[in-house]
Amino acid sequence: SNNIVKEIRYIEYPNPSQDVIKKFLRDYIKWNFEEQAKLAAETFPNPTYEIIDEVVIVYYKVFINDQPPKLPLDHVDTLLSSFLFWEEQEFDTDNKKAKVKFEITNFRQDANVWVTWIVRDIGEGVLGHAHLGKGIVEVTLGDYNCDGSFQLYDVKSVETIMTHELGHSISLQHVTDQNNIMYASYTPSYAYCLLS
């Protein structure tokens, strides 16, 4: 017992998950588009397009919601990786080749897509939400499924969820191929949970 008193203990990598959820809950409306997500996507402007060398280029203007300061993981870079993933794809539509391009805007009213990261529960096993074709994209940063307390997903999981949800925002549906990013199911990994 005397040895325990003298023992110095520290945690090399403390789990910031609880601090993150507190940051999001302090100013709930600012960090969440919950009310806007209930509205119809028809209120968003349509993406624009042009045809270059017989390829339809569809332009999406994206508003990126602020995040609480000093989050432990970088999610904005995962969004940029998700943009790049879809911009590298070529689609067939109406017997024409099509590509997408994303442009970030600071003005919500100009955006076809609003992106935000959330910590609220959006349904059992639901990792994200997106309107089809235009509208809101919400990506959860964690859940309560690892050890019963809120735990953050790792960066790769958040990127995978974001890429999937952005796929919906450019009008892609779920597919049956389990190796496709648009497959309906995904099991995320945790950044800090000791039980994962």
PLM-predicted stretches and their roles:
Residues 63-65, 118, 142, 185:
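Generic beta-structure capping elements
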Residues 65-69, 144-148, 188-189:
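A short, flexible beta-alpha/helix-coil linker loop
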Residues 73-177:
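Metzincin-family zinc-dependent endopeptidase catalytic domain
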Residues 173-195:
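Post-HEXXH active-site segment of zinc metalloproteases
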